[in-house]
Design a protein with these regions (language model features):
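Interdomain hinge/lid region at the active-site interface
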Residues: 224-295
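Glycine-rich, N-terminal phosphate-binding loop of Rossmann-like dinucleotide-binding domains
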Residues: 76-78, 111, 163
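Phosphate-coordination loops involved in phosphoryl transfer and adenosine-cofactor binding
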Residues: 13-16, 104, 156
Length: 304
């Protein structure tokens, strides 16, 4: 079932990386690794994508026979697809792993929600005996698909990690391995959190922004915006262009947290609407000043 590799010996990054799913994120992992001289094995259900990726990026197919050659395996697909792949290949991952020596490929995902994926992945890893760490690269564009992937997509980007509930020594070992394995991709900052905290915060920082942008362009006035719009319109509508299948799955998997954020936003917008309907300039000015003050404080905190 292939050879067992020890990620710890490959200082500076992996020698071989496996990628499951060659969309924007998976394709960017593949291109980034290939550009750094890392051998890339991959699998994607679309034969045309595999053919395109084989031209200078992917060296071969990732399967049960070859996954043991990898130092890291990146699951870059939708939540249910990640879980399904792990369930199908759990035994092969176990066969490629020596838990006594902490050897074998470390598996990470790139899914935008962590709760549903990490719960099942940690369970499978514990039952079968392989290593999994939840991960979420905070990078992307409004486009999707391998054609839009870039080798430099993750340069300077944050990477959020969700380790399993294991003893501190093993947790530090796994986190260290992941950081070493993604080094060639140029991530700028690493954060460690729990799956529940990740999903609570990401509902605000990412999912809500997509909902707001997507809803904003549904105004009938959007049909006549040309010639009247500049940076504000462009910034607010950038992520209205999205992958509905992927984002609906992510949002449903984080439904409670996202619904909370939407309801809170509706309440805030209601205050602005009341001020306008009442022609209450002082109240409106206070609302605007409050938002400005909060944003400045957040920016100052981030700068320090």
């Amino acid at each position: 079932m292939g050879t067992v590799r020890n990620a710890r010996v490959n200082q500076g990054g992996p020698k071989c990386a496996g990628i499951v799913g060659l969309g924007l994120i998976g394709g960017s992992f593949a291109r980034g690794y290939a550009q750094a001289g890392v051998r890339v094995l991959a699998w994607d259900p679309d034969d045309d994508v595999m053919t395109a990726a084989s031209m200078g990026t992917v060296a071969g197919e990732l399967n049960d026979e070859t996954l043991g050659e990898c130092d890291i395996i990146v699951l870059a697909c939708y939540p249910e697809a990640c879980i399904e792949w792990l369930e199908t290949h759990a035994q092969a991952l176990a066969d490629a792993t020596d838990t006594e020596a902490i050897m074998g490929p470390v598996v990470i995902d790139t899914v935008g929600v962590k709760g549903i994926v990490c719960e099942r992945a940690f369970e499978l890893a514990r039952e079968h005996g392989f290593y999994f760490v939840g991960a979420h690269p905070m990078a992307g564009t409004q486009f999707s698909g391998y054609a839009h992937s870039r080798a430099d997509l993750f340069q300077g980007a944050p990477l959020v990690l969700v380790p399993p509930a294991v003893d501190d020594a093993l947790k530090l070992e796994l986190l260290g391995q992941v950081r070493e394995m993604v080094r060639p991709l140029g991530f700028g900052k690493f954060s460690v959190t729990s799956a529940s905290e990740h999903d609570r915060v990401i509902a605000f920082t990412s999912q809500l922004a997509h909902v707001v942008s997507n809803a904003y362009v549904k105004s009938p006035t959007a049909q006549v915006h040309h010639g009247f719009s500049a940076g504000s319109y462009r910034d607010l509508t950038r992520v209205a262009h999205l992958n509905p299948q992927m984002w609906s799955e992510l949002m449903i998997d984080d439904a409670d947290a996202l619904a909370f954020e939407i309801d809170h936003l509706i309440d805030s917008l209601g205050a602005y609407s009341r001020a306008l309907k009442d022609r209450d300039q002082r109240y409106l000015e206070n609302l605007l000043a409050e938002g400005d003050r909060i944003k400045r404080a957040l920016d100052d905190e981030a700068a320090h």
